[in-house]
Amino acid sequence: FLAKKVAKTVAKQAAKQGAKYVANKHME
């Protein structure tokens, strides 16, 4: 359903944000 698609998109966005956060922390 649409909700599942939205959840997948949100998860993808969260993963991208998480990766960016980890990268920034690693840079410090």
From Swiss-Prot:
Keywords: Amidation, Secreted, Toxin. The keyword 4Fe-4S does not apply. The modification Glutamic acid 1-amide is found at E28. GO terms for biological process: defense response to bacterium. One of its GO terms (molecular function) is toxin activity. It is found in: Secreted. Expressed by the venom gland. Belongs to the cationic peptide 04 (cupiennin) family. 01 subfamily. This is Short cationic peptide-1b. It comes from Cupiennius salei.
